[in-house]
């Protein structure tokens, strides 16, 4: 059986008011509650991007409730992509500015920003219209809060608590403008304290690996799910 998680506030799903402004952390707790209440026996968790952060939180904070984790193109601290020496403290001002800009921008500017962002995240032009529609159908405050949370949450100190196997699938494309070895080093360094980990690179893909290289991604998932 497969459980598909739809996060409130994204892609047309009604938003949930959260005074703390967190999205990933309460989602992880809600999934942990779901696993308990549905009496699921340590499911396999696959998460992409924000979902990858949620999967890491589940593995670190509820290690007995999951069997394995697949993290798809996500780091335990998002801001490392922009600054390898970043800390939560140094990331906060930039994250706040980005959040405030998202909240303040008029609709036309928001659409232009999302369109430009998606062009960097999906190499497949055919995949972009649906991604844009999902982005524009998302609650703006939820998106802004999630972005701030991702940019200021450093899960590296928690990685040592993950007791189950972890596979990190990450994208690479020459259009990134940096050598593949640099991207690999970024991921390996970020996950250095994760006990049982392996990495898989999928080439000729941007961030939305499952859309840019669907066959390669499907194979990676199938291999991962083998007992």
Briefly describe each language-model feature range:
Residues 4-46, 60:
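Active-site loop/oxyanion-hole signature of alpha/beta-hydrolase fold enzymes
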Residues 7-10, 74, 171-173, 204:
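Active-site loop/turn elements of alpha/beta-hydrolase fold enzymes
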Residues 10-13, 77, 208:
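Active-site loop signature of alpha/beta-hydrolase-fold enzymes
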Residues 41-83:
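Conserved hydrolase catalytic core segment
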Residues 67-105:
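Flexible "cap/lid" loop of the alpha/beta hydrolase fold
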Residues 105-178:
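Alpha/beta-hydrolase
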Residues 165-206:
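Conserved loop-alpha-helix segment in the C-terminal half of the alpha/beta-hydrolase fold
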Residues 202-214, 218:
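Catalytic histidine-centered segment of alpha/beta-hydrolase-like enzymes
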């Amino acid at each position: 059986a497969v459980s598909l998680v739809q996060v409130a506030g994204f892609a047309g799903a009604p938003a949930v008011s959260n005074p703390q402004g967190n999205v990933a952390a309460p989602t992880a707790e809600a999934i942990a509650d779901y696993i308990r209440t549905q009496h699921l026996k340590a499911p396999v968790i696959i998460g992409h991007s924000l979902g990858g952060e949620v999967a890491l939180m589940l593995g670190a904070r509820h290690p007995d409730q999951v069997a394995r984790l697949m993290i798809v193109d996500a780091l335990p601290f998002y801001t490392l992509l922009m600054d390898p020496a970043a800390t939560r403290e140094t990331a906060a001002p930039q994250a706040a500015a980005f959040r405030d800009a998202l909240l303040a921008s008029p609709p036309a500017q928001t659409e232009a920003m999302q369109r430009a962002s998606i062009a960097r995240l999906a190499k497949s032009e055919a995949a972009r219209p649906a991604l844009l529609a999902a982005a524009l159908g998302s609650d703006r405050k939820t998106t802004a809060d999630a972005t701030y949370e991702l940019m200021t949450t450093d899960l590296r100190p928690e990685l040592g608590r993950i007791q189950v196997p972890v596979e990190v699938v990450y994208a690479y494309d020459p259009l990134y403008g940096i050598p593949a070895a640099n991207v690999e080093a970024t991921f390996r360094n970020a996950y250095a304290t994760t006990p049982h980990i392996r990495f898989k690179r999928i080439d000729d893909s941007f961030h939305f690996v499952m859309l840019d290289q669907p066959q390669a991604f499907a194979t990676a998932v199938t291999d991962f799910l083998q007992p």
